[in-house]
């Protein structure tokens, strides 16, 4: 299932999941501050789950 998720991210975003591991303030481990853009906000919302 993780491979399918990677394929979905690549198809929609045009980049693999590794790109987002250190993206913005909230994509990847931890997070603090204000989300930098819509993608970072999505990671922020996910972190709040």
UniProtKB/Swiss-Prot annotation:
SMART domains: PA2c. The keyword Metal-binding applies. Expressed by the venom gland. Ca(2+) binds at residues 26, 28, 30, 47. Keywords: Calcium, Disulfide bond, Hemostasis impairing toxin, Hydrolase, Lipid degradation, Lipid metabolism, Metal-binding, Myotoxin, Platelet aggregation inhibiting toxin, Secreted, Toxin. Its EC number is 3.1.1.4. The active site is at 46. GO terms for biological process: arachidonate secretion; lipid catabolic process; negative regulation of T cell proliferation; phospholipid metabolic process. Its cofactor is Ca(2+). Disulfide bonds join 27-43. SUPFAM superfamilies: Phospholipase A2, PLA2. It is an enzyme of class 3 (hydrolase). GO terms for cellular component: extracellular region. GO terms for molecular function: calcium ion binding; calcium-dependent phospholipase A2 activity; phospholipid binding; toxin activity. It catalyses: a 1,2-diacyl-sn-glycero-3-phosphocholine + H2O = a 1-acyl-sn-glycero-3-phosphocholine + a fatty acid + H(+). PANTHER family: PHOSPHOLIPASE A2 FAMILY MEMBER, PHOSPHOLIPASE A2, MEMBRANE ASSOCIATED. Belongs to the phospholipase A2 family. Group II subfamily. D49 sub-subfamily. Snake venom phospholipase A2 (PLA2) that has a high indirect hemolytic activity and a potent inhibitory effect on platelet aggregation induced by ADP and collagen. Also produces a significant paw edema reaction in rats. This edematous response is abolished by pretreatment with either indomethacin or dexamethasone, suggesting the involvement of cyclo-oxygenase. May be myotoxic. PLA2 catalyzes the calcium-dependent hydrolysis of the 2-acyl groups in 3-sn-phosphoglycerides. Monomer. This is Phospholipase A2 2. It comes from Lachesis muta muta.
């Amino acid at each position: 299932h993780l491979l399918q998720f990677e394929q979905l991210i690549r198809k929609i975003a045009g980049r693999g999941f590794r790109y987002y591991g250190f993206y913005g303030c909230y994509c990847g481990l931890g997070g603090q501050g204000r989300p930098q853009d819509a993608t970072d906000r999505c990671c922020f919302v996910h972190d709040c789950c």
